[in-house]
Swiss-Prot record:
InterPro entries xrefs: LysR_subst-bd, Tscrpt_reg_HTH_LysR, WH-like_DNA-bd_sf, WH_DNA-bd_sf
Localization (cell): Cytoplasm
The organism's place on the tree of life at top rank: Bacteria
Recorded GO MF terms: DNA-binding transcription factor activity; sequence-specific DNA binding
Family annotation (PANTHER family): GLYCINE CLEAVAGE SYSTEM TRANSCRIPTIONAL ACTIVATOR, HTH-TYPE TRANSCRIPTIONAL REGULATOR
Cellular component aspect of the GO annotation: cytoplasm
DNA-binding region boundaries: 23-42
Similarity-based family: Belongs to the LysR transcriptional regulatory family.
Organism: Escherichia coli (strain K12)
One of the protein's GO biological processes: regulation of DNA-templated transcription
Protein name: Glycine cleavage system transcriptional activator
Length: 305
């Protein structure tokens, strides 16, 4: 009997596709194309000599063999992940300097950092908040979270968080004298702006809301102040999904409708390619990428093209 094992990459793709029951969602999680997912699944099915998926109408389903295989693979991946984490926790020690924008640090990383500290007590994380992002890593920085299009030559670049801009407001605005139920209702409410004012103009143009005056409403110099104004019922803000997520989960903000502005930018984890697998850096990469992927799956926005 052959002892040959299927390619690990094909198994990773199968695991993602089986969890989501969607090649598209699996591709998004793994940051590959849907065609690449289909190719890996076919190669795995050819290797095994049986079908793992079947289609019913427009739904993707596991075959009986695929379901059984998925349950076994899922357990193996879980054991592999835990074994890797334990090994890295023993070898990952020392100071780790993380550079990022203050807004991402305050709203996302810092509230979640305790779970990393618990898993890797030997690593001393040092947060370096920078108001202006450079296109290269400073000499005293181990890893950074960059915002942009992902084009930073000479660095290991891994997509961390896709960016959407979504309308958010206090729950009180949904049931007030002028309830906010559809995008057209924005004409009856104060718009909150950051210094550029561009976001509301782009958003209303995308939805064809030509009757809305995007010049009205107060301007704030920092995105954190825009969110606070929205929380206190002073108007409607266009918020970055990463920054607004915790406020929405806590119930202080709501997203009144699903029409969101899809950004061409995203947040990326970057480090020197030659150092990516070093103990403390590899541990942080694995932790933050898994954390971000799990949260985006739970907190996915629907949007209209």
């Amino acid at each position: 009997m052959s002892k040959r094992l299927p390619p690990l990459n094909a198994l990773r793709v199968f695991d993602a596709a089986a969890r989501h029951l969607s090649f598209t969602r699996a591709a998004e999680e793994l940051f590959v194309t849907q065609a690449a997912v289909s190719h890996q699944i076919k190669s795995l099915e050819d290797f095994l000599g049986l079908k793992l998926f079947r289609r019913r109408n427009r739904s993707l389903l596991l075959t009986e063999e695929g379901q059984s295989y998925f349950l076994d693979i899922k357990e193996i991946f879980s054991q592999l992940t835990e074994a890797t984490r334990k090994l890295q926790a023993r070898s990952a020690k020392g100071a780790l300097t993380v550079s990022l924008l203050p807004s991402f640090a305050i709203h996302w990383l810092v509230p979640r950092l305790s779970s990393f500290n618990s898993a890797y007590p030997g690593i001393d994380v040092r947060i370096q908040a920078v108001d202006r992002q450079e296109d290269k890593l400073a000499d005293d920085v181990d890893v950074a979270i960059f915002y942009g299009r992902g084009n930073w030559p000479g660095l290991r670049v891994e997509k961390l968080y896709a960016e959407y801009l979504l309308p958010v407001c206090s729950p009180l605005l949904l049931t007030g004298e002028k309830p906010l139920k559809t995008p057209e209702d924005l004409a009856k409410h104060t718009l909150l702006h950051d210094a550029s004012r561009r976001d509301w103009q782009t958003y209303t143009r995308q939805l064809g809301l030509n009757h809305i005056n995007v010049q009205q409403g107060p301007i704030f110099s920092h995105s954190a102040m825009v969110l606070q104004a929205a929380i206190h019922g002073q108007g409607v803000a266009l918020a970055n999904n990463v920054m607004a997520q915790s406020e929405i989960e806590a119930g202080r903000l709501v997203c009144p409708f699903n029409d969101v502005l899809v950004s061409k930018n995203a947040f990326y984890l970057v480090c020197h390619d030659s150092q990516a697998e070093l103990g403390k850096i590899a541990a942080f990469r694995q932790w933050i990428l898994a954390k971000a992927a799990a949260e985006q799956e739970k907190f996915r926005f629907r949007y209209e093209q």
